[in-house]
Amino acid sequence: MAEYRFLDDARWRGLCFFGCRIPGEKMVFGSCPSRDCIEGIADGFVIKPFDPQARVITIPFGEAEGKETYHEENTDFPYYPTAKAFYMKHAGIIIDYLRENPEKKVVYSRVLTCETRKSLTDIFETLCRTYPMAYVFCFRTPQTGLWIGASPELLGEFSKQSFKTVALAGTMLAARGGKWSDKNKREQKIVADYIRNILSTAEAKHIYEKDGEKIAGPVKHLITEFSATLPDDVKAETIIEQLSPTPALSGYPQYEAIEMIVEHEAYRRGCYGGFCGIHNHPVYGKSCLWVNLRSMRINASNQCAIYSGGGLMPDSEAEEEWLETERKATTLLSVL
C-alpha cells in the first residue's frame, strides 16, 4: 500500500497528480509534477472530458520537488443524486424517440452520491486488488477536480503505427448464463461498426478482430478487440480524437446523441465518458488511453459522485436500464 500513498499526499498539498495501474500489471505509474498542466496531448497523463468541444489537458511526467500550489478546483460538482422518477421520465422520453428512429442509440447516465471516510490510498489499493483486469486510475487537476475509477474499456493502445482498441457494449449479469439478447447484440454492433469505419477511413492495414465477453465486476459485456497498423501519415492521436466519445459512451449518431444527453441529464458529465491515460511513458514504452468509466468524482469534503450509465435502444425498458446502472455502480460502491 505504501506505493499508493503519494495520492493522498499530493491531494492535500493541492498538487496536480495522477496514478494508474494497467490491467494485468503490478507496476503503478504516478506523477506529481512541478509544472502546471499542459494543453493538448503531450508526454504525460492525458485527460479528455466527455464534451467533444472540451480541450485535452496533460499532467506531465515528473516530481513535485516540494512545490505546493493549492489550485482552486472546478466547482461543477453534482451534489444531489439523480432521482428515480426523473430518470424514468427522461429515459422514457428518449426510448419513445428511439422507437421512432430505430437505427439510433443514446447512452443515458445518472449520478449516485455518498460520502466516504476512506483515503485515496485505500480506495485505489482496493480497486487494484478487487479488479485486477481493470484500468485503475486516479487524477486531480484544477480544471477537472479529483477522479478515481476502474475502467474495463480500452480506447487506444499504441506505439508508432501499431494500434489497438475495443468495442465494448451490451450488459448482463456476469453470473447469468444463456444467450445475449438481440438488443445487446445490436448495441454492441453499433460501436464495432463505428470503429471499423474510422479505421477503414484512415486506410489502416492488417485489421484483426476478435469477439468475446469481458467481465467487469458484477456484470459482463460483449467485446470486439481490434488491432491494426496505421499508415505512416496517420497519427494514432488523431484516431483517438475521432473515436472519443464512441457510441458506447454517447450513442449514435454521435452529435445527435450528445444533444439528447445534454437535454435530459440534470448535470454535466465532466470527465465521465471521456478518456485518460499515459502517453509516451519512458518506462512503459507505449501509450495507453482508457475510457473514463466506472468512475466517480470526490470533492474536498469527501463527498462522492458516482456516474453510471447504459445504452438506450428502441426495445429498452426504463426499469431494467435503471437496474443496470445500479449493478454497474457497485464497482465503486463496494469499495467505499
Which role does the model predict for each range below?
Residues 8-17, 21-23, 40, 110-190, ...:
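An anion-binding catalytic pocket shared by soluble metabolic enzymes
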Residues 230-336:
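Conserved hydrophobic core element of enzyme catalytic domains
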Residues 46, 100-101, 156, 257, ...:
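A residue-level signal for conserved active-site and pocket-lining positions in enzyme catalytic cores
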Residues 142-145, 211-219, 275-279:
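A glycine-rich phosphate-binding loop feature that marks nucleotide/adenosyl-phosphate handling sites
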Residues 20-118, 160, 174, 182-186, ...:
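Non-catalytic accessory segments adjacent to catalytic cores
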